[in-house]
Amino acid sequence: MDGTLLNAAHEISEENINAIKYAQSKGITVVIATGRAFYEASTPMAETDLKVPYICLNGAEVRDESFNIMNTSHLNHELVERIKAILDREDVYYQVYTNRGIYTEDPTRDLDIYLDIARNAGQQGDVEKIKAGIQKRIDNGTLKIVDNYKDIEDIPGELIMKVLAFNPDLEKIERIGKELSAISSLAVSSSSRGNLEITHSDAQKGIALETIANQLHIDLQDVMALGDNLNDVSMLERVGYPVAMDNAMPEVKAIAKLITDTNEHSGVGKAIMKVLTEEK
């Protein structure tokens, strides 16, 4: 979504909406695949009348068109403790995503994360606006404050799905990413240079997309996927027609068969229509 389907204002353009509807009218299944939690992903979608399945939290949660949860992959206690030990040792700030919300120990440090997200989406990052957004999340309960992340596992029914770590020291982030990647049960990706998105190894966009394709009896070679960042690579590498946004990272462009326009200029819609027009 961010950097791909959404523009800098976190909106889905009419061109993108119309292209998705056109694809659906041809019997094509369109799936949202995002690092966002469902309650974040569904907000911009609510401004449209689109009905689609969702791959959320990089594949940690899959929902059908009616929002029913079809599959989840969470981090067990041992993995959570290993992640926390590494991040705490390196003094790297992180948020914990669960099946019910996002947890923070220090909302003042969340500002850095959301400024980074804004920059990644092509915004300069209005500090006061982002502060207001953080407060809104706290007020509506999607961003929850805890004294200690250990308290989360004591809450009945709470499952830890993803850890989002952030640090402006890119060398440190890269080093930590390599250390975490060495843990076989973890998948480590990123949605910008300054962050790490840590999930269970079963929770990857590519794995979730393959599962959906198999359920629909669709060959992955007949699937098109679009993305802009490293958390899209597992998906783009699996499909027959990988598409990179013009604003994508070089590593993403390197594996694409097509480079479409930017997220600011409805690159998703343009790519969909290009492929469907060529098929005619």
Give residue spans per PLM region.
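Short active-site oxyanion
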Residues: 27-31, 51-52, 162, 221-222, ...
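Asp-based phosphoryl-transfer active-site loop
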Residues: 1-9, 83
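Active-site phosphate-binding/coordination module
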Residues: 14-124, 128
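Conserved acidic, metal-coordinating active-site core of Asp-based
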Residues: 90-92, 98-226
